Regions:
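Short, solvent-exposed loop/hinge segments that bridge or flank secondary-structure elements
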Residues: 47-59, 63, 69-101, 125
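Predominantly extracellular/secreted and cell-surface proteins with exposed
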Residues: 82-231
Length: 323
C-alpha cells in the first residue's frame, strides 16, 4: 500500500480497472435467500455495475468517508537462508469517493503506515537491522493525498507522473471488470493485483545505501471478502469487507540495505470501518500526535499523488557511508 505497482493494483485496479485480468468465475446472479428481501441481482459482466461496486468497496457513495485498516508483518527474504519476520506494520487510511459529472468517481484518500515491534506492537522510531547490526531511523509512510479515478473503462496506469484525473474517453476503451469469485454460500471475493518493473526514483548513484538498484521489481495482491447479501443490497452505500494483502518489494530504503540480494514481503489483513474504534488505541494515539490532518479524507481532488518512494526522494537525505 505504499507505492504504485501497475494498472492492476489497488493504485489502479479500482481506479483503472481489472479488465485485463480474466475473471476467475463470472457466476450467475446471486439469488436472495430470505423471502421478501429486496435484492439487486449482480451483473458481473456490466462495466457500469462494476464501477459502482468498486466505489462502494472504497467508501460510501453518498460522500461519507470510510476508515481503512491493515495490520500485518514485514518479512525479510534473502537467498540461502530462511525468511524472518522483521517488523509489524499498521496502516491508517481515510477514504472518500465523490461522483463526477460523467458518472465516474474521484477516489481520494490519505494514508499512514506505521512500523511496529512485532512482539509488543509499539510503533518504532528506530530499528536494529539484524542483517547489518546497524541501528537505523524508521521512516513512516505518510501520503496526502493518494487519489485515482474509478471509471467504467480501463484508464491509464497510476504510475509516477501519469495524468489520471482528466483524460478523454478512448475510442477503443476496454470495459472495467473486477475479478469476481463466487466463493461460498455467503461470500463473494474480489481479487486484484499486478506485477511491475519500473525505474527506481532513488538513483543508486545518489542513494547508494538506500537504493536496491536502478529498477524496482514489485508485486502486489489483494483479496476482498464481501457478504453477498450486502453486494445485492443496492441501498447500502458502502460494502464492508475484510481482506488479505501481499506485497513483494525491494528492501525499504531506510533499512540501508543497498543492493544486498533479497527483498521484503508484506503480509497483511485489512478491513473497512466507519469509526476510529476500528483501530488499536495506540495507532490512533500516534495518528493524533503526528498526523492529525489524516483523520479526515479529502473532500475534493488535489495533488499530485506522490508515492512513498517519491516522498522519500523528496524529503530525506542520503545516509552517510557506514564507518
Amino acid at each position: 500500500m505504499t507505492e504504485p505497482v501497475s494498472s492492476t493494483t489497488r493504485r489502479g485496479a479500482l481506479g483503472v480497472g481489472l479488465g485485463s485480468l480474466a475473471p476467475l468465475i463470472l457466476a450467475p446472479p446471486l439469488e436472495a435467500k430470505a423471502a421478501g428481501t429486496a435484492r439487486t441481482p449482480a451483473r458481473f459482466a456490466d462495466p457500469v455495475w462494476n464501477r459502482e461496486q468498486a466505489a462502494r468497496l472504497q467508501a460510501h457513495t453518498d460522500g461519507r468517508q470510510v476508515y481503512g485498516r491493515c495490520s500485518g508483518v514485514v518479512h525479510g527474504i534473502r537467498p540461502g537462508e530462511a525468511g524472518r519476520a522483521l517488523l509489524g506494520f499498521e496502516v491508517f487510511s481515510t477514504i472518500r469517493v465523490v461522483r463526477r459529472p460523467d458518472g465516474n468517481y474521484d477516489r481520494m484518500s490519505k494514508e499512514v503506515v506505521l512500523y511496529t515491534d512485532p512482539i509488543t506492537g509499539k510503533a518504532l522510531d528506530e530499528w536494529d537491522n539484524p542483517y547489518t547490526g546497524e541501528r537505523v531511523r524508521v521512516v513512516e509512510i505518510a501520503n496526502d493525498p493518494y487519489n485515482w479515478v474509478i471509471r467504467d473503462f480501463v484508464g491509464p496506469p497510476a504510475l509516477p507522473g501519469a495524468e489520471t484525473h482528466n483524460i478523454p474517453e478512448p475510442k477503443d476503451k476496454k470495459p472495467f471488470l473486477l475479478n469476481w469469485t463466487d466463493f461460498s454460500a455467503d461470500t463473494v471475493v474480489v481479487t486484484e493485483g499486478g506485477h511491475a518493473w519500473y525505474p527506481n526514483q532513488l538513483d543508486p548513484a545518489k542513494w547508494p545505501r538506500e537504493s536496491a538498484g536502478p529498477m524496482v521489481q514489485a508485486s502486489e495482491l489483494f483479496r476482498y471478502f464481501i457478504n453477498r447479501a450486502d453486494l445485492e443490497n443496492g441501498s447500502k452505500t458502502h460494502l464492508p469487507h475484510n481482506g488479505v494483502w501481499i506485497r513483494v518489494t525491494p528492501w525499504l530504503p531506510w533499512m540501508l540495505m543497498g543492493t544486498e540480494p533479497g527483498h521484503i514481503l508484506y503480509d497483511g489483513m485489512f478491513s473497512s470501518g466507519d469509526s476510529l474504534e476500528h483501530y488499536k488505541p495506540a495507532v490512533i494515539a500516534r495518528i493524533r500526535e503526528r498526523y492529525p490532518q489524516y483523520l479526515e479524507a479529502p473532500t475534493k481532488w488535489y495533488g499530485p499523488s506522490v508515492s512513498s518512494i517519491e516522498h522519500y526522494a523528496l524529503e530525506q537525505k542520503p545516509a552517510p557511508a557506514r564507518k
